[in-house]
Amino acid sequence: MRILILGAGKMGSFFTDVLSFQHETAVFDVDPKRLRFVYNTYRYTTLEEIEEFKPELVINAATVKYTLDAFHQVLPALPKDCIISDIASVKTGLKEFYDQCGFRYVSTHPMFGPTFANLDKLSTENAIIISEGDHLGKIFFKDLYQNLGLNIFEYTFDEHDETVAYSLSIPFVSTFVFAAVMKHQDAPGTTFKRHMKIAKGVLSEDDYLLQEILFNPRTPAQVEGIRTELNELLDIINKKDCLLYTSPSPRDGATS
């Protein structure tokens, strides 16, 4: 299959590495310097090159801020029978775009990234495939993610957004609070060091991604839940009430 990957960033390079030995791949990026670090693939910077390549599948690996812009830029150069796809973690506006774009589509969310995941060992990681997508496109990504050892779930766009609001907003907000109140420690304990490592990783994420997660309409309810639990915990601490305190544990089905 001829596969065009949009964006030569970390995830774009990852998908290129995974796919280039079994498929004919090309990577498109408006910044030629970013293409220096992708191998065993065609490297494109113009729409004319895309037209000549005639991709059968497009994987949009641009950062969240530019996902829709990248689609709009390349659509005129694509064959009408091409399947377009995204791997965005935040899918704001994508369903509306797909409904009117005139192309078959598939939308997925590999729920791992280069910040924390070991990309060589993904058996503990998850991926979501959006159920509204094209049947053949979903089969392609299901096979790909199974070969990577990922745990696969199929959700609607709405179910995906609800899951992301829970699984991303809670740890991100908790990390922001930790980073805001923590002080430098010359001799930190193990737990502190682990939290600090996570905080540095989260705060190094793309600013637009953090904004989209925080401003997700479903995020305020999750933050309210955190505030309620903190208020109850503070009340227990102030009263020194051992009977009220029970060590919290992850709820069934919760993931970190």
Feature names for model-found ranges:
Residues 154-247:
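An accessory alpha-helical subdomain
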Residues 78-93:
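ADP-ribose/adenylate-binding Rossmann-like module
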Residues 49-71:
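Rossmann-like NAD(P)-binding element
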Residues 39-47, 102-105:
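Active-site regions of enzymes building and remodeling cell-envelope glycoconjugates
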Residues 245-256:
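Single conserved hydrophobic/aromatic residue that forms the stacking wall/gate
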Residues 90, 94, 98-151:
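Rossmann-fold dinucleotide-binding core
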